[in-house]
From Swiss-Prot:
Compositional bias of kind Low complexity: 48-61
Family membership: Belongs to the CDV3 family.
Residue ranges, compositional bias (Acidic residues): 73-82
Residue ranges with Polar residues bias: 95-114
Protein name: Protein CDV3 homolog
Source organism per UniProt: Drosophila melanogaster (Fruit fly)
Alphabetically ordered keywords of this record: Phosphoprotein
Entry-linked Pfam families: CDV3
Residues annotated with Phosphoserine modification: 134
Length: 271
């Protein structure tokens, strides 16, 4: 019996181990809900007591006091705080850097120019700004010179562009109409140019044609009717007048048949 109990006890242990390996979906949901419901317990910060001594939370009931020089207890849970991102899109860094560099250059150059232009006092002492009227110097003139000073404020004279005159091309009107060779020769002869068939002989100018001349302008009324030639073996047509037809008498035109022998040679052979 003891052996059977041990055997079943081992089986129960194996079953319990197998059950713990697999977790159902319901159990996972419950664990997640329990985790979200748990409140984060923050440790209390040490309170500073009178006399400059800090008291830790666990040691408050016991009354033990921890000196301030002791290292602070690290908190187990730290709250995550998102840093607010600043918008630097409108910041002009390049412009600020150029302005600062330009100001430093102007200040340096102005100090150098001022040191070079400060005249010595007549008594051999240092120059004083109060003596400007007596010496004839004015800060306004110096400031005007400083304004135009510097490579970024130099006015570059505009280069004069030489305008090259463009030759105007005269369009040649070429006539696209066809001119016969005879007319070309006549035009060349009229203009005094040679090369015609007559060797450049002068010809009379073109005159208006005579419209009444029937030789150049024939008309239909002046045309003579020509008799049409009849072709051979062409059938004749009957002429119709007053709606009646001429009835021609049919005459027998057939030649009489000769039954007698017209050739005497046959008679000679028969005899």
């Amino acid at each position: 019996m003891a052996e059977l109990d041990d055997f079943f006890a081992k089986k129960d242990k194996k079953k319990s181990k197998n059950k713990t390996k697999f977790v159902t979906a319901d159990e996972m949901v419950k664990n997640l809900e329990d985790g979200t419901k748990r409140e984060v317990v923050k440790p209390k910060k040490p309170e500073v007591a009178a006399g400059g001594v800090a008291v830790v939370g666990e040691n408050e009931n016991s009354g033990t006091k921890v000196p301030e020089s002791a290292p602070p207890v690290e908190e187990e849970w730290k709250e995550f705080e998102e840093e607010q991102r600043k918008d630097y899109s409108g910041l002009k860094i390049g412009q600020l850097s150029t302005i600062s560099s330009a100001r430093s250059r102007t200040a340096q150059e102005s100090s150098e120019s001022q040191a070079a232009r400060v005249p010595s006092a007549p008594d051999g002492g240092n120059y004083n700004e109060d003596d400007e009227d007596s010496n004839g110097y004015d800060n306004a003139d110096v400031n005007k010179e400083r304004v135009g000073h510097g490579p970024w404020k130099k006015v570059v004279p505009a280069e004069e562009v030489m305008q090259i005159p463009v030759p105007v091309e005269v369009e040649k009107h070429s006539s696209k109409t066809y001119v016969s060779p005879a007319l070309r020769y006549s035009q060349q002869a009229g203009s005094g140019l040679g090369g015609g068939p007559t060797g450049g002989a002068l010809r009379p100018r073109r005159a208006a044609p005579d419209i009444t001349n029937t030789e150049f302008f024939p008309t239909l009324s002046a045309a003579r009717p020509e008799e049409q030639r009849k072709k051979k073996n062409e059938p004749a047509f009957e002429e119709v007048r007053h709606g009646s037809r001429f009835q021609r008498v049919q005459e027998s035109t057939a030649a009489p048949v000769a039954a007698s022998n017209r050739f005497q040679s046959l008679d000679d052979e028969a005899s």
